[in-house]
Amino acid sequence: MRFTKFYAPSLKEAPKDASLPSHIFLTRAGFIEQIGSGLYNFLPLGKRVLDKIKNIVKEEMDKAGAQEVNLSFITPASLWQESGRYNVFGKELLRFKDRKENEFVLGPTHEEAMLSLVKNKITSYKQLPLHLYQIGLKFRDEARPRFGLLRCREFLMKDGYSFHANEEDLGCEFELMYKTYSQILQRMGLDFRAVEADSGAIGGSGSKEFMVLAKNGEDDILICENCDYAANVEAAKRAKKTCQDERPEANYASKFHTPNIKTIDSLAQFFKINAFYTIKAVVKKAIYENESKLVVFFIRGSDDLQEIKAQNACSALELVDASEEELEKAGLVAGFIGFVGLKDIDFYIDFELENEKQMIMGANEKDYHLIGIDVVNLNKDRFKDLIEVKEGDCCAKCGAKLKQSKGIEVGHIFKLGQKYSKAMNANFLDENGKSQPFYMGCYGIGVSRLLAVAIEASHDEKGCIWNKTLAPFVLEIIVSNLKDEKALEFANKLYEDLTNLGLEVLLDDRNERFGVKMNDFELMGFPYALVIGKGLENNEIELIQREGLVKELIKTDELMEILKKKVL
């Protein structure tokens, strides 16, 4: 492609709302253009990268035996109501009516639509397993779209759904998709981890996220460097903590006057103990479909509450902070809340506290705490995983220290089980002739998001740094002076030869200053550039590698051999 014929408008300034490198550089370099809040056009450069990502995804999915379909972007609301997700999904689900008052949604995911596609058509276990996928647009009405393609409202996604006769077969497909997604990301040259994850509004049991490691990542992940354990902080587990400091001793539930001791730090100082031996109460207002109520979560004083875990524990749609007025109305005394004698309030206790002895917690009375508390003889259903695992905690799998890192989610695979098929009455006949709901799996990968993630993971202060797999052009030929007829002739001949070899080459034949051309090369980030200038008089041209901006003078008679080694 000749630059004079190619549409790639670059900008000197970054968008005012751009803070991340991918947003800044992809916009400035002419890969994408914002047309509204969270809405982006893909220009030719961006479309070339997008197509490469799509092709890799498609090749690997097809290789795994999945079949491609293309579902409507719009889904009847009745399908979402049937599955029970219509209200659960919240305001991110864009709902609208047509002129006949029929209700529809713009699909952020397509579980319901895909299940509807096979319902009453796949009727026997002999037709299973089946895996269908699509690569298409999704819409999620984000409250605060930001970070360019990383959190936008309209996005391109590959979503696949598998149908099985039993849980064992679903497990096999889950493992196959784990390997397939790993292969997709490896082919793209991305440093990633597959981590344990929360299933969110999609639901299901088994869940793994694929995280690309990047310092600007919005997700915290915990990685064990001794074994293969890795998890999103929302789902991370640890080996149970211990403490060697002296434990307080007292008769069971002794009441102790603690004037104005409202915080864990002040409580630990007051009793001259480690906060490990205290119990912290965190009060939240749980939002449900038709009601809201206060819920108390009890965790060790030295720990912090993980809100997604807490939300899952009480099956709420959302958790928000409770006001002082709400606490007073419920009869709760801020700073002095405990589970002994707590009435008419739902509460949960972190499972690490089960069977702990000689603990200290609030007495549900102003300026009083209970000491000598044994966490025993409580309903097992009250014990949940509630705490936030942190760097330095020990791996639940091998006991080694966990390290915290930043990552960006690019893919998510779920074992949905029978959640959707039961809700939508989608059944098949098993080998005994008995009607059974399908076992389902769900597998998503953010195609347009990967474009931004690649740059978050690979850039410098000058611009993008693409690898050869994803780059819109692998090589740019830059003629430093268009008035140099010999250089221009050499460049044109080289361009034709390399193009005929199947190499994706951009010939910068613009009548611009050399500095402008170099700035654009550094901004757009193609893996290599050949600069043809005065050195041609000595049969030399300059090869520049974008990563590190490494420069090398090459003799013209050695050029093709070197390009075949490094570029082709």
From Swiss-Prot:
Domain of life, per the record?
Bacteria
Question: Which InterPro entries does the entry link to?
Answer: aa-tRNA-synt_IIb (IPR002314), aa-tRNA-synth_II (IPR006195), aa-tRNA-synth_II/BPL/LPL (IPR045864), Anticodon-bd (IPR004154), Anticodon-bd_dom_sf (IPR036621), Pro-tRNA-ligase_IIa (IPR002316), Pro-tRNA-synth_IIa_bac-type (IPR004500), Pro-tRNA-Synthase_IIa_type1 (IPR023717)
Its chief place of residence is cytoplasm
GO BP field: prolyl-tRNA aminoacylation
Write down the chemical reaction(s) this protein catalyses.
tRNA(Pro) + L-proline + ATP = L-prolyl-tRNA(Pro) + AMP + diphosphate
Uppermost EC category: ligase
Transmembrane domains' residue ranges: none
Please provide, alphabetically and separated by semicolons, the GO molecular function terms listed in this UniProt record.
aminoacyl-tRNA deacylase activity; ATP binding; proline-tRNA ligase activity
Q: Which UniProt keywords apply?
A: Aminoacyl-tRNA synthetase, ATP-binding, Cytoplasm, Ligase, Nucleotide-binding, Protein biosynthesis
Subcellular location(s) of the protein? Cytoplasm
Q: Name one Pfam family in it.
A: tRNA_edit
- One GO CC term, this protein: cytosol
Q: What does this protein do?
A: Catalyzes the attachment of proline to tRNA(Pro) in a two-step reaction: proline is first activated by ATP to form Pro-AMP and then transferred to the acceptor end of tRNA(Pro). As ProRS can inadvertently accommodate and process non-cognate amino acids such as alanine and cysteine, to avoid such errors it has two additional distinct editing activities against alanine. One activity is designated as 'pretransfer' editing and involves the tRNA(Pro)-independent hydrolysis of activated Ala-AMP.
Domains: entry comment: Consists of three domains: the N-terminal catalytic domain, the editing domain and the C-terminal anticodon-binding domain.
Quaternary structure per UniProt? Homodimer.
Protein's name according to its UniProt entry: Proline--tRNA ligase
> What organism does the record attribute this protein to?
Campylobacter jejuni subsp. jejuni serotype O:6 (strain 81116 / NCTC 11828)
Q: What is the lineage of its organism?
A: Bacteria, Pseudomonadati, Campylobacterota, Epsilonproteobacteria, Campylobacterales
